[in-house]
């Protein structure tokens, strides 16, 4: 729960001086990106902005405290303040913030600005006490906020110092409105107004001016002088002389003498006890101070001018002026040291009664009460964990003695899940092993099963599927039906293990079961994970259309539950990119891969390896080797600076080896082949992929025999495990092996198998990347006119893609080529004596590329009858009677010119 007072603008108090000159300056705040109010404590920053905000509706207010350095807490309150300003317009951001479903503050702010694009009237967001922020991530995120905020939004920041928000740049661009301590200092006229409404007997204007000068217009000093003058008989000027030259850091003695020593003992204790509360209401005051009429007491303290201010329009929430509050907390530690733990315990109990466990934990920690802290955690820790209050939980668990954790194994489990969420896998097992060693009878029963479920998740994350399977099965055997979270975890792990082992049908069933349980219990990240796994399994089985439909369900879940910022979102858009690439929808595949990189923009660059490999695949399919090389440089740098799952390494190696194949870089392939891992098995798609990489490198090096052994074994495994997409890929690589080895009939046989299987998978780009060798074989098959209709159509589509994205074959017959051809000593005499026109050379190139008459007409944008005329003329000039003879003639010319066809 969010504390309402932190989101409430302070109420404009009676007897305050209206700062007309400053309000006039602030009236143009909507013309600036940032309004910055800076001064030391006590200059009236908050009072000024509360006066300016009075009557404004489209304004959000966020009062900071020390706890707001936690990113998740900062995000929750800031978005809540924006919701306040827009009357609930930013619903998606609110859900994302509440459920912690965002990758970073910047990505959350980006979503906020998308929602605000539809809001056209002026908006204001006030952040008070920004000097309390010390987290550099928040500073950087707020710089992003200011750079990208909509033109109609003005950020108003109140701070005791100059915040790290790129102020200089804003100042240069005239996007900054500044009010500093010199402007905030009271003028003589404002000081006179102040004393006139605070003192029963007015003072002369000259006296008021002298007092104002003595304290340099410092508002807090003027307030202290007025308070002292009311409580004592000495003059205001005498108090002013005492305060002259004193600043906020030297006020303690003065406040003791002039404030605390001039109130009765009951009021003194009330001030000291209540000061431990960052915000307070009637119930908190009753419990912490023991006074029955807390609201009345707070209003009385406010009337006495003891630096207490209302935090909301209802008047229910109060807080002390920061300067006075800090002073009181320090005095409380000195004067009430013995009582302080009990005071904090009372505060914790009251916060708990009002439903604010995080505030209660703050006081339980301050009280040093391990038992209270334990009880709060036992009741609320998992809720805080699910809301990503990880820093607070970690601090709390560290404060508990080990014996307390052993007495409450669920807290050990919580600590282990915290470690798991931070990828500290080794520490998880160490912690659980130690707990099991020391807790009696823990090695059986429900808690042991929950330990095993977590251990199983750690094992699969750490690349140990056999151990993960053993632990997941043990957990499922021992977990009661009602322990849904651990059952979801164990079922998901078991499904992933079966996926790794190639048992795709069983794995798919378990992932569908995981999805059903996760949806039933609102465990959305596991629901998303299970859908992603289902899609991968269906892709491996060759059911790409069903995989697509499963991905659509996952995208729908992301939209409904606002999971866009989860790292798993990148996984989904990446496998969508892989599917689009397979279908030769390269522009969409590239856009999807880039969106995956955007999701991971706040993470380490190593996390982007997979999407980067996908971008390289797109470049390779287009034949854009320059771009591929540039991206490969970055990929190889990432490979050398990180530790990756075998699946990631396999995908990275794939694009490297294909690039070497396309560029004929045998040295790089040979060096890689000497050092790359040779997996023991090939029973899943990523192990198949790595062995395929090895075979491709061997083919490039002319090592046909070992490559054939590898590919035949891969095919045997793929057929037995029904890894149909891998079988399709393997057949294509085997085709290249046979073609290069001169075994043309074998090459044609496996190519026909690959084309037939592609009717199921829909593969296009897997054929395209094999380039001219594939194009030549497809041209021959098309000319034979013996392919079934579906295979014929696919072959023509693949050929068009090769011609579009790779070097156009008719480009061999451009003007430069024709000139060199005609000057070649071996050119046929018929070509010399009856030269073709440039258009006829282009038509010959397209015939050689396998284009039909209609396709040639479309390519050259002329009528089909015109193409027939060109074909008749070139046949006559070449001395050929039919299309196949023209193809053979073109092939001879290309070979003569040194082209490897």
From Swiss-Prot:
Looking at the record's lineage, which domain of life comes first? Bacteria
Q: How might one describe the regulation of this protein's activity?
A: Activated by ATP and maltotriose, which are both required for DNA binding.
Q: Name one GO biological process term.
A: positive regulation of DNA-templated transcription
Q: Which InterPro entries match?
A: P-loop_NTPase, Sig_transdc_resp-reg_C-effctor, TPR-like_helical_dom_sf, TPR_MalT, Tscrpt_reg_HTH_MalT, Tscrpt_reg_LuxR_C, WH-like_DNA-bd_sf
Which residue spans does the record list as DNA-binding? 853-872
A Gene Ontology molecular function term for this protein is: DNA-binding transcription factor activity
| Lyase among keywords | no
Pfam families recorded for this chain? GerE (PF00196), TPR_MalT (PF17874)
Provide the residue positions that the database annotates as binding ATP. Answer: 39-46
Pinpoint the HTH luxR-type domain residues: 829-894
For this UniProt record, give its keywords in alphabetical order, as a comma-separated list.
Activator, ATP-binding, Carbohydrate metabolism, DNA-binding, Nucleotide-binding, Transcription, Transcription regulation
Q: Check the UniProt entry and state the signal peptide residues, or none.
A: none
UniProt family annotation? Belongs to the MalT family.
HAMAP family given in the database record? HTH_type_MalT
Q: How does it assemble?
A: Monomer in solution. Oligomerizes to an active state in the presence of the positive effectors ATP and maltotriose.
Q: What does this protein do?
A: Positively regulates the transcription of the maltose regulon whose gene products are responsible for uptake and catabolism of malto-oligosaccharides. Specifically binds to the promoter region of its target genes, recognizing a short DNA motif called the MalT box.
The name of this protein is: HTH-type transcriptional regulator MalT
Q: Which organism does this record belong to?
A: Escherichia coli O127:H6 (strain E2348/69 / EPEC)
């Amino acid at each position: 729960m969010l504390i309402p007072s932190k989101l409430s603008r302070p109420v404009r108090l009676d007897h305050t001086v209206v700062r007309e000159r400053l309000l006039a300056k602030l009236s143009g705040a909507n013309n600036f990106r940032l309004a910055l109010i800076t001064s030391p404590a006590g200059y009236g920053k908050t009072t000024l902005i509360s006066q300016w905000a009075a009557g404004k509706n489209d304004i959000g207010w966020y009062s900071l405290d020390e706890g707001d350095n936690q990113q998740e807490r900062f995000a929750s309150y800031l978005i809540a303040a924006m919701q306040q300003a827009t009357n609930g317009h930013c619903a998606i951001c609110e859900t994302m913030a509440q459920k912690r479903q965002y990758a970073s503050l910047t990505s959350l702010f980006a979503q906020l600005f998308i929602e605000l694009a539809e809001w056209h009237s002026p908006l204001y967001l006030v952040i008070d006490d920004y000097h309390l922020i010390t987290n550099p991530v928040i500073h950087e995120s707020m710089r992003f906020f200011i750079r990208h905020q909509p033109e109609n939004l003005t950020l108003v920041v109140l701070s005791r110092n100059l915040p790290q928000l790129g102020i200089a740049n804003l100042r240069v661009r005239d996007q900054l409105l500044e009010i500093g301590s010199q402007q905030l200092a009271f003028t003589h006229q404002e000081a006179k107004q102040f004393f006139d409404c605070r003192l029963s007997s007015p003072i002369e204007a000259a006296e008021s001016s002298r007092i104002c000068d003595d304290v340099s217009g410092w508002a807090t000093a003027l307030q202290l002088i007025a308070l002292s003058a009311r409580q004592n008989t000495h003059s205001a000027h005498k108090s002013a002389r005492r305060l002259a030259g004193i600043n906020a850091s030297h006020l303690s003695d003065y406040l003791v003498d002039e404030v605390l020593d001039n109130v009765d003992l009951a009021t003194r204790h009330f001030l000291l006890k209540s000061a431990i509360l960052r915000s307070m209401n009637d119930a908190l005051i009753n419990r912490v101070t023991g006074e029955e009429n807390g609201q009345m007491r707070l209003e009385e303290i406010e009337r006495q001018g003891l630096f207490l201010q209302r935090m909301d329009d209802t008047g229910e929430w109060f807080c002390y002026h920061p300067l006075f509050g800090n002073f009181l907390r320090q005095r409380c530690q000195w004067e009430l040291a013995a009582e302080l733990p009990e005071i904090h315990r009372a505060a914790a109990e009251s916060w708990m009664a009002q439903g604010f466990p995080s505030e209660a934990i703050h006081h339980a920690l301050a009280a040093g009460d391990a038992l209270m802290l334990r009880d709060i955690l036992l009741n609320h820790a998992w809720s805080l964990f699910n809301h990503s209050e990880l820093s607070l939980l970690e601090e709390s668990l560290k404060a508990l003695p080990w014996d307390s954790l052993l007495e409450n194994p669920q807290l050990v489990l919580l600590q282990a899940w915290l470690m798991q969420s931070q990828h500290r896998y080794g520490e998880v097992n160490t912690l659980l092993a130690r707990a099991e060693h020391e807790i009696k009878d823990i090695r059986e029963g429900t808690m042991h099963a929950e330990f095993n479920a977590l251990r199983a998740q750690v094992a699969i994350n750490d690349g140990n599927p056999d151990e993960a399977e053993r632990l997941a099965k043990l957990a499922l055997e021992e977990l009661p039906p009602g322990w849904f979270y651990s059952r979801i975890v164990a079922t998901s792990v078991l499904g992933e293990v079966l996926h790794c082992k190639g048992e795709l049908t069983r794995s798919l069933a378990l992932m569908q079961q995981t999805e059903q349980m996760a949806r039933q219990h609102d465990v959305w990240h596991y629901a998303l994970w299970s859908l992603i796994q289902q899609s991968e399994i269906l892709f491996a089985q060759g059911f790409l259309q069903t995989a697509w439909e499963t991905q659509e369900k996952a995208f729908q879940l992301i939209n409904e539950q606002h999971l866009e910022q989860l790292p798993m979102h990148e996984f989904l858009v990446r496998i969508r990119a892989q599917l689009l690439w397979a279908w030769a929808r390269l522009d969409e595949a590239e856009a999807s891969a880039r969106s995956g990189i955007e999701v991971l923009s706040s993470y380490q660059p190593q996390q982007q390896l997979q999407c980067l490999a996908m971008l390289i695949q797109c470049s390779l399919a287009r034949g854009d080797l320059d771009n591929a090389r540039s991206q490969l440089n970055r990929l190889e740098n990432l490979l050398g600076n990180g530790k990756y799952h075998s699946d990631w390494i396999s995908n990275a190696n794939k694009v490297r080896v294909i690039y070497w194949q396309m560029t004929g870089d045998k040295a790089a392939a040979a060096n890689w082949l000497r050092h790359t891992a040779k997996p023991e098995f090939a029973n899943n798609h990523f192990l198949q992929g790595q062995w395929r990489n090895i075979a491709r490198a061997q083919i490039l090096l002319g090592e046909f025999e070992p490559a054939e052994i590898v590919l035949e074994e891969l095919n045997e495994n793929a057929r037995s495990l029904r890894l149909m997409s891998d079988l399709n890929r393997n057949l294509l690589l085997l085709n290249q092996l046979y073609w290069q080895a001169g075994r043309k009939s074998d090459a044609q046989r496996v190519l026909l198998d690959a084309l037939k299987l592609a009717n199921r998978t829909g593969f296009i780009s897997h054929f395209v990347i094999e380039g001219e060798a594939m194009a030549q074989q497809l041209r021959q098959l098309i000319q034979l006119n013996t392919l079934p209709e579906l295979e014929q159509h696919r072959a023509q589509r693949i050929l068009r893609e090769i011609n579009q994205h790779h070097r156009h074959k008719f480009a061999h017959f451009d003007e430069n080529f024709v000139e060199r051809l005609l000057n070649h000593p071996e050119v046929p005499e018929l070509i010399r004596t009856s030269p073709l026109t440039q258009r006829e050379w282009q038509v010959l190139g397209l015939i050689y590329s396998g284009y039909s008459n209609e396709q040639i007409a479309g390519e050259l944008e002329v009528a089909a009858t015109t193409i027939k005329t060109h074909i008749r003329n070139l046949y006559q000039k070449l001395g050929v009677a039919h299309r196949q003879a023209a193809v053979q003639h073109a092939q001879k010319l290309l070979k003569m010119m040194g082209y490897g066809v």
